[in-house]
Each structure stands twice: as structure tokens, then as C-alpha cells.
């Protein structure tokens, strides 16, 4: 926290993994919170996954970038769990996320990794990235329709090659600043797009992924209201998996440990809000004796 803004490195990556393990409101160790540029790209996935498996007990993620990375990660997860190949494939042990190349395209290396995951029974989240006014129509209806078309195309492909494989649809639809072209997050448009997608994904009967995004540059008031807006849109849409739930800044260009902790406070409050409703009506629950003891006034 005292080292200022800098490029991502392996030490910072490990620090974020320790934060991930510490907070119970974080359930998954997703992608790289920072890109450890001091580790060569050819072996980065091996070192990063090793730290995830040794520093956390959270569900891990593989970047779907072709055969080598995905196969390496699946094998490391299988070995870490002491599993046979049949046991590994019997139920979800990890997951990946792929993004479409809007409009109306999927990148082959991502599809290749996703298909390899699906064939071994591991979940794939398909998340089109559609920005209204950029690579998607400027209307919310058009942007959401485009996102759903791209997501369903990927879902259909995976079900074709591995019928019944676990798949989720993601939403990452927002608007752009029409002056600068920069993505905007935590806006009313982002929230509405998330909720529109949630309604349709429930209709299709598959799980939903959304995100705790913001576009602010520092962990300030703007950062927190944008992230809170995004998180409330997620839970109101009955999201099953929230990406980027803690630590996100500047549209994902910055990972902030300070904001990670601030976001976890918000996540814990939301979790508390969604706990089972209170039906307790006994005298002890209502604290009748305490009320009588204090009396009026």
C-alpha cells in the first residue's frame, strides 16, 4: 500500500492472493489481479496457479488462451486434488471465462481452450464484452441483444461438442463516454443492461455472471458508488458469479489493495442483507424483559 502506482509484479500478485484467502466474502481466485510482468509469459500461468493452489483454498481459474495454458492448469488442479482423470471429470473443479470479439465474433484461441475445458467437464463462462456506442449499438436493447446472440452462439457450440457440459452466460454490457470513448461502469445503463440480461438468462435456465466494476481512477467516493451500483445490479439480477468484485479501478487497468478491502466491506454488508429473514417472535427474541426493565421514556 505504501509503494505507489507501479507495474504488476509477482510479489504483488501473491499479496492479492493472500487478501483473497483472508476475506470469506471472496469465493473464487479468478484471473490475475495484477499481471506479474516479471514472470515470462510462457510460464506465467504455471507460477501463478501454483501460488493460487498453495496460498488459497478458493476455486481457481484458467485463462482460455489456447491448448497449452488450459491443459497445464487442468492437470495442475487434478494433481493438487489427488484426483484420477475420471474423478476430475466427474464434477466441476475449476472454471474458465471467455469473451467474444464483438460484434458477432469469437476468438479461436479462446474457443479452443473453452472446448478443451468442456470436454473434460469443467465450467465455461461465456461473457460478451459489448459497449453501447462502440462495438455495439448505442441503444441498450441493441447492445443487450448483441451480447445475448454472441453468448448463446458460444453456449450452443459447447453443448454441441460436449452435451450437458456446465456453462454460464456472462454480461459485460455498458456504455461509453461519447466525448472520450472511454468505457463507463457503474452507470444506470450498466445496471439496466445487467438486469435485462439477468431476466433473459433466467429464461434460458443457465447461471449468470456479472461484475463489480467501476471507472474511477482512485479509491474515492466515485469508485465506491460505481462499484456499489454494479454490485447491487448483480444481486438484483440474481447473479450466480460476480467477477471483479474487489479491488477494481479505472475500468480494470488498476488493481488497488486499498479498494479491495473497501469493496469487501460492501460485499459483507450485501451478504448480511441477503441472509435469511428474521421470523423470531419469542419473548427472548423480542427482548421483552429488557423493554420492561427500561420502561417508558
Residue ranges of each PLM-predicted region?
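Charged, low-complexity surface segments at secondary-structure and domain boundaries
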Residues: 2, 61, 254-256, 292-293
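Helix-rich catalytic cores of soluble enzyme domains
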Residues: 2-240
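Catalytic-core signal marking the mid-to-C-terminal active-site face
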Residues: 258-297
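Acidic/polar loop patches that form or flank catalytic/metal-binding clefts of enzymes
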Residues: 206-212, 241-246, 276-285
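Histidine/acidic-residue-rich catalytic or RNA/ligand-binding cores of hydrolases
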Residues: 221-222, 253-257
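Glycine-rich phosphate-binding active-site loops on the catalytic face of alpha/beta enzymes
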Residues: 233-254
Amino acid at each position: 500500500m505504501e509503494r505507489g502506482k507501479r507495474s504488476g509484479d509477482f510479489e504483488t500478485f501473491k499479496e492479492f492472493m493472500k487478501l483473497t484467502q483472508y476475506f470469506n466474502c471472496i469465493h473464487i481466485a479468478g484471473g490475475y489481479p495484477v499481471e506479474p510482468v516479471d514472470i515470462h509469459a510462457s510460464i506465467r500461468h504455471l507460477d501463478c496457479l501454483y501460488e493460487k493452489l498453495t496460498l488459497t483454498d478458493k476455486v481457481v481459474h484458467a485463462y482460455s488462451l489456447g491448448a497449452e495454458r488450459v491443459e497445464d492448469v487442468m492437470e495442475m488442479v487434478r494433481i493438487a486434488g489427488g484426483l484420477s482423470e475420471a474423478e476430475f471429470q466427474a464434477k466441476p473443479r475449476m472454471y474458465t471465462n471467455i469473451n467474444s470479439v464483438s460484434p458477432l465474433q469469437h476468438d479461436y484461441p479462446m474457443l479452443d481452450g473453452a472446448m478443451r475445458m468442456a470436454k473434460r467437464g469443467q465450467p465455461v463462462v461465456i461473457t460478451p464484452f459489448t459497449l453501447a456506442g462502440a462495438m455495439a449499438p448505442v441503444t441498450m436493447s441493441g447492445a443487450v441483444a448483441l451480447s445475448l446472440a454472441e453468448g448463446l452462439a458460444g453456449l450452443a457450440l459447447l453443448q454441441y461438442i460436449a452435451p450437458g457440459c456446465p456453462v454460464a452466460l456472462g454480461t459485460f454490457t455498458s456504455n461509453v463516454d461519447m466525448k472520450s470513448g472511454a468505457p463507463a461502469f457503474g452507470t444506470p445503463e450498466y445496471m439496466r443492461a445487467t438486469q435485462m440480461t439477468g431476466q433473459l438468462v433466467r429464461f434460458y435456465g443457465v447461471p449468470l455472471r456479472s461484475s463489480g466494476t467501476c471507472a474511477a481512477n482512485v479509491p474515492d467516493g466515485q469508485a465506491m458508488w460505481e462499484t456499489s451500483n454494479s454490485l447491487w445490479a448483480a444481486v438484483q439480477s440474481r447473479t450466480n458469479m460476480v467477477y471483479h468484485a474487489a479491488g477494481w479501478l479505472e475500468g480494470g487497468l488498476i488493481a488497488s489493495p486499498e479498494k479491495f478491502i473497501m469493496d469487501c466491506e460492501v460485499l459483507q454488508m450485501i451478504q448480511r442483507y441477503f441472509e435469511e429473514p428474521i421470523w423470531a417472535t419469542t419473548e427472548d427474541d423480542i427482548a421483552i424483559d429488557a423493554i420492561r426493565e427500561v420502561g417508558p421514556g
